Amino acid sequence: MEIKQIAVAGSLESSDMMITISPNDGQGIVLELDSSVEKQFGNHIRALIKTTLANLGVESATIEAVDKGALDCTIQARTIAAVHRAAGVEHYNWKEIDSWNA
C-alpha cells in the first residue's frame, strides 16, 4: 500500500497511542517511538507496528508513535487506521485483517 499523504490515528489519552504516518520517498520504514514503557516493551511495540505495516504492504513510510500504555490490539488498530487514511483507502478488507490473528 502506498502512503500518499500525512495521516494521524489515535490520541494522547492514557492507554492509547497516537500514530502519525507520512510518505518518505522510498527510504524504507523509519519508526520513531516515544513511550512511557519503552524500556520494558519498546522492542515489542516496534515489532508489532512493523509487522502490521508489512501485513498492509507498506514498504516505505515515516512513522511517529507516541504510546501512553496502549495494548497490542490498540497499537494494531491505530496503525491500520493511520495507514488506510494516509493511502486514501476508504474500504477495509476485514477478512484479511482478521486472518492476521489466526
Swiss-Prot record:
Domain of life: Bacteria
Encoding gene (name): citD
Major location category of this protein: cytoplasm
Keywords: Cytoplasm, Phosphoprotein
Signal peptide: none
Localization annotation: Cytoplasm
Cellular component, GO, one term: cytoplasm
Protein name: Citrate lyase acyl carrier protein
Claim: Phosphoprotein is one of the keywords in the record: yes
Membrane spanning stretches: none
Summary of subunit composition and partner proteins: Oligomer with a subunit composition of (alpha,beta,gamma)6.
HAMAP family documented for this protein: CitD
Family: Belongs to the CitD family.
Purpose: Covalent carrier of the coenzyme of citrate lyase.
Location of O-(phosphoribosyl dephospho-coenzyme A)serine modifications: S14
UniProt KW Phosphoprotein keyword: yes
